[in-house]
Amino acid sequence: MVMNIRVLTPDRVICSTTADEVVLPGLTGQVGVLDGHAALITALETGLLRIKLNDKWTPIILCGGLAEIDRDRVTVLVNDVEELTDIGLSEATQELEKATLAVENAKTSKERLDASVELKKATARLEAVNYLS
C-alpha cells in the first residue's frame, strides 16, 4: 500500500506524491514511516528526507521544520529546502570537511551555531549523493 506525502515551505509546494516508505530527519534520529503509521507530530532537524516509491529513493534536503503523520498521509512543513545539484562524491566530501573545520575553528557562539547548521547540510548533501549514485 502507498501513502501520500506533501513537502511544503511557507511559499511553495516542494512535492506532492505517493510513497511506499518515508524516512524523516527527526531531532532524536531518523523516523521511518510506513503506511498505517500511528498519528504523530514531530519536529525535524536539518537533514535528509528520503522518499521511497517502487524501490527508488528520492532525497530532499530539509532545513528544519515539522512533520504530521496520520496513517496514510505525511505532511512535512519546513522552513526551506536545499535544491540538489549535480554534486559529485568528492565535492560533497570536501564540503563536509570544510564544514567540520568551520565548526572546530568557530570562536563565537554565533559562528559555532552557523557552522553547525552548515555541517548538517553538508552531511545531508553527502547522504543525498550516496542515494543518487
From Swiss-Prot:
Topology class, membrane: Peripheral membrane protein
Organism field: Phaeodactylum tricornutum (strain CCAP 1055/1)
PANTHER family xref list: ATP SYNTHASE DELTA/EPSILON CHAIN (PTHR13822), ATP SYNTHASE EPSILON CHAIN, CHLOROPLASTIC (PTHR13822:SF10)
Main localization (coarse): plastid
Protein task: Produces ATP from ADP in the presence of a proton gradient across the membrane.
Keywords linked to the UniProt accession: ATP synthesis, CF(1), Chloroplast, Hydrogen ion transport, Ion transport, Membrane, Plastid, Thylakoid, Transport
Protein name: ATP synthase epsilon chain, chloroplastic
Pfam families, per database record: ATP-synt_DE, ATP-synt_DE_N
Quaternary assembly: F-type ATPases have 2 components, CF(1) - the catalytic core - and CF(0) - the membrane proton channel. CF(1) has five subunits: alpha(3), beta(3), gamma(1), delta(1), epsilon(1). CF(0) has three main subunits: a, b and c.
Cellular location(s): Plastid, Chloroplast thylakoid membrane
Keyword Plastid: yes
NCBIfam families associated with the record: ATP_synt_epsi
Example of a GO MF term: ATP binding
Gene3D superfamilies: 6.10.140.480, F0F1 ATP synthase delta/epsilon subunit, N-terminal (2.60.15.10)
One GO term describing the cellular component: proton-transporting ATP synthase complex
InterPro entries for this protein: ATP_synth_F1_dsu/esu (IPR001469), ATP_synth_F1_dsu/esu_N (IPR020546), ATP_synth_F1_esu_C (IPR020547), ATPsynth_dsu/esu_N (IPR036771)
Entry's family note: Belongs to the ATPase epsilon chain family.
